[in-house]
A protein has these predicted regions:
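PRPP-associated nucleotide enzymes
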Residues: 1-314
């Protein structure tokens, strides 16, 4: 078994290798002045079981293309099996045709991964679970919930309500509420556009409660901060947010700085610089991904990785 990494999140890749007990594979990735990428595998991979760690986070197109080139290089070097480890799956929000003449880009990415020579995909907290069905190869879909739970249980939170910031996240919120033995609520919203919310309402009892907002990803933080604001007006004692993938562009960072969210709990699936003025706790999923890689390599079951106290995450 050998583990390689693109440039998207080498910090996570090194942590995964440490948890497995192996060295990160030697690879030369060089950008050309015209924007093209050159890749050379610097060690023998003939007959090897290969894992490539590359979240397709922003810059999404660059990281995707880099991944395809690495896969092609490994395939042409006679690797036995190639598993693409995508801690974050880019384009996951484009998972359906919701208006005329638009693509289903999440499916296109799946097609391109298979065409490039991948034999298996390992990913985490897909924005839309049906993306697993876009592939004609095995997909192992992990969840950050067990890592989040281990952190949250140490807080010994009382009067807790788990809140989904929209209708789409109710399944995730329900799993958290069952595990944490907490009440469940939802913020129902009506959108003007993909980036603008017209109105919001809270369904559930919030007054005097400690609130935990849960979501799979945030970029502009509009949904999170708007939900937190209305929860505070409804009498929430405190508001924390658990988000698996915190992509956080400049708009999102500024919104969080001005928000009433007391703590944002996220993971290291995507790499980002330190952010001043925002209370962010970053939990590592390196151990979880590392264990999955070991089990896939040994052809063992990964079923137990979907489970944590309170039941399954799926």
């Amino acid at each position: 078994m050998k583990v390689f990494s693109g440039t998207a999140n080498q910090t996570l890749a090194l942590a995964i290798c440490k948890s497995i007990g192996c060295e990160l594979g030697k690879i030369n990735i060089t950008p050309f002045p015209d924007g093209e990428t050159f890749v050379k595998i610097e060690e023998n991979v003939r007959g090897e079981d290969i894992f490539i760690i590359q979240p397709t986070s922003p810059p999404t197109n660059h990281n995707l293309m880099e991944l395809f080139i690495i896969i092609d290089a490994l395939r042409r070097a006679s690797a036995m099996r190639i598993t693409a480890v995508l801690p974050f799956y880019g384009y996951a929000r484009q998972d359906r045709k919701d208006q005329p003449r638009v693509p289903i880009t999440a499916k296109l990415v799946a097609n391109l991964l298979v065409a490039s020579g991948v034999n298996r995909v390992l990913t985490m907290d897909l924005h839309a679970q049906q993306i697993q069905g876009f592939f004609d190869i095995p997909v192992d879909h992990l969840y950050a919930a067990p890592v989040m739970y281990d952190y949250l249980k140490k807080k010994k939170l009382t009067d807790l309500v788990v809140v989904s910031p929209d209708a789409g996240g109710i399944k995730m919120a329900h799993a958290y509420s069952q595990t944490l033995n907490a009440e469940l609520a939802i913020v129902a919203k009506r959108r003007k556009s993909a980036t603008e919310v017209e109105s919001m309402a809270v369904i559930g009892e919030i007054e005097g409660k400690n609130v935990l907002l849960v979501d799979d990803l945030t970029e502009t933080a509009g949904t999170l901060t708007s939900a937190a604001a209305i929860l505070k007006t409804k009498g929430a004692k405190s508001v924390m947010a658990c988000v698996s993938h915190a992509l956080l562009n400049d708009t999102g960072i500024e919104r969080l700085r001005k928000s009433v969210i007391d703590e944002l709990i996220t993971t290291d699936t995507v790499q980002r610089p330190a952010i001043d003025g925002v209370n962010i706790t970053t939990l590592s999923v390196a151990g979880l991904l590392g264990e999955a890689i070991k089990r896939i390599h040994s052809n063992s079951s990964v079923n137990s990785l979907f489970e944590f106290k309170g039941g399954r995450t799926s």
